[in-house]
From Swiss-Prot:
Cofactor(s) the record lists: Fe(2+)
Catalyzed reactions per annotation: catechol + O2 = (2Z,4E)-2-hydroxy-6-oxohexa-2,4-dienoate + H(+)
Source species of the chain: Pseudomonas putida (Arthrobacter siderocapsulatus)
Occurrences of domain VOC (ranges): 7-122, 150-269
PROSITE patterns xref list: EXTRADIOL_DIOXYGENAS, VOC
Subunit structure of this chain's protein: Homotetramer.
Binding residue positions for Fe cation: 153, 214, 265
Residues in coiled coil: none
Protein family per UniProt: Belongs to the extradiol ring-cleavage dioxygenase family.
UniProt protein name: Metapyrocatechase
Keyword Repeat: yes
A Gene Ontology BP annotation from the UniProt entry: benzoate catabolic process via hydroxylation
Length: 307
């Protein structure tokens, strides 16, 4: 059921060296720098995104994700969702408008998995970057690197998947698109969506709370993914795996690391979903094929390296 949460809006990542991080996210991934603030944070967006930013980089002593934000339709929805979060048992932090430049007030909470999320209704509308809103060209001609199209989702590792599932489905209005279950039917991975996309956020069971696996960015075509792989080699960027295809979600993908060790994904394609679709289920004994459809064997680094 729609509860007023629209889509992923932003992710704030911790990086060890801002200069090196910007080489990665701007020059390689192709995000556009939009602003900086007095805390030293840098605000980035992909060119098709209409709001001011979708990625915030913060220099810190250890890498990882500070929080992921979702945009809601209006202030009334934000107020109602705040009450629902409190009734669910979440502790709420109200973050003032302007704490993130160009963003309205945010309501932050912690999921049972240990990850921090936030909801907001307002963010400065800047339109797509480099193209007009009237008679727009197909794409800007001065994009860099992989020319990421949009910030798409995050994959997160933590425990208490069932309670996290209940929070995201019953309170926030997500639905289960795909899952991995063990022989007893216990869910080990859950891919949750707000839209017709394959997923907007995903969780995999892990003993330690609050771990970050990757932030993902959409590309248009398989040829774009192959070109991204070329750029990864040209820049001696640390690669995890790919190009390959997922069984889960059907995305065609490649994974690589920023200089701080945060994992990134660029992908194209993927399943679509409508409200009458039943969740796709993968069995844990076949998880190799679910994750890497071609190799059918798990890459140990993919399952064990996180920030």
């Amino acid at each position: 059921m729609n509860k007023g949460v629209m889509r992923p809006g932003h992710v704030q990542l911790r990086v060890l060296d801002m200069g090196k991080a910007l080489e990665h996210y701007v020059e390689l991934l192709g995000l556009i720098e939009m602003d900086r603030d007095d805390q030293g944070r840098v605000y980035l967006k992909a060119w098709t995104e209409v709001d001011k930013f979708s990625v915030v980089l913060r220099e810190a002593d250890e890498p990882g994700m500070d929080f992921m934000g979702f945009k809601v339709v209006d202030e009334d929805s934000l107020n109602r969702l705040t009450d629902d979060l409190l009734n669910f048992g979440c502790l709420i932090e109200n973050v003032a408008a302007g704490e993130l430049k160009g963003c309205g007030r945010r309501v932050r909470f912690q999921a049972p998995s240990g990850h921090h999320f936030e909801l907001y209704a307002d963010k400065e509308y800047t339109g797509k970057w480099g193209v007009s809103e009237v008679n727009p060209e197909a794409w800007p001609r001065d994009l860099k690197g992989m020319a990421a199209v949009r910030f798409d989702h995050c994959l997160l590792y933590g425990d208490e998947l069932q309670a996290t599932y209940e929070l995201f489905t019953e309170v926030l209005g997500f639905y289960l698109a795909e899952q991995v279950v063990d022989a007893d039917g216990i869910r080990l991975a859950q891919f949750l969506s707000l839209s017709t996309k394959a997923h907007d956020v995903a969780f995999i069971h892990h003993a330690e709370k609050g771990k970050f696996h990757h932030a993902s960015f959409f590309l248009d075509t398989w040829e774009d993914v192959l070109r991204a792989a070329d750029l990864i080699s040209m820049t001696d960027t640390s690669i995890d795996i790919g190009p390959t295809r997922h069984g889960l979600t059907q995305g065609k993908t490649i994974y690589f690391f920023d200089p701080s060790g945060n994992r990134c994904e660029v992908f194209c394609g993927g399943n679509y979903n409508y409200p009458d679709h039943k969740p796709v289920t993968w069995l844990a004994k076949d998880v190799g094929k679910a994750i890497f459809y071609h190799d059918r064997v798990l890459n140990e680094r993919f399952m064990t390296v996180m920030t």
